[in-house]
A protein has these predicted regions:
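Conserved nucleotide-sugar phosphate-binding/catalytic loop shared by glycosyltransferases and other
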Residues: 5-7, 15, 34, 39-89
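Short beta-strand/turn micro-motifs composed of small residues
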Residues: 12-13, 42, 112, 129
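Gly/Ala-rich phosphate-binding loop of Rossmann-like dinucleotide-binding domains
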Residues: 28, 32
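Conserved nucleotide-sugar donor-binding subdomain of glycosyltransferases
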Residues: 75-117
Length: 139
């Protein structure tokens, strides 16, 4: 029986709270146990948590940051609608960043948590999300 080929996997959780990073931990643990090489990409508190949990893994902290804030009062939907153009720009920057990183680091697979710019047409990419049904009032 042949062993499956080992991959270099980029795992990139969003920094909108530690839930995004902690949700990736079981996948990282499994891939490491299976002998894959995992490279992490995040910023802020998520990056700190990942570096603490996986001190021997490479961490790319130059990934574009969404710099999200939550409203202190009022509608979350309205708050994000106001920041839509900036968020869209970050998705574009994220996508360009990934194209470069795939070549520089020979990434063979991507797993992102709510980072919508991390897709590549030549390698498998997956996205983790907890949003099953986005309720957008103006659609």
């Amino acid at each position: 029986m042949n062993a499956s080929p080992k991959h270099r996997i980029l795992v990139a959780p969003l920094d909108w709270g530690l839930g995004h990073a902690t949700r990736c931990a079981p996948l990282i643990d499994r891939w490491l146990a299976d002998g894959h090489e995992v490279i992490l990409a995040s910023n802020g508190r998520s990056a700190l948590w990942l570096k603490d949990r996986y001190p021997n893994l490479e961490l790319l902290s130059d990934i574009p940051d969404y710099c999200v804030t939550y409203p202190t009062r009022g509608s979350m939907t309205l708050h994000f609608a106001k920041h839509f153009l900036r968020l869209r720009k970050v998705v574009q920057l994220e996508h360009a960043w990934l194209q470069r990183i795939v070549l520089e680091k020979n990434i063979q697979q991507v797993c992102s948590d709510n980072r919508y710019g991390l897709y590549h047409h030549e390698i498998p990419c997956s996205i983790i999300t907890h949003q099953l049904n986005l309720r957008v009032p103006f659609l």
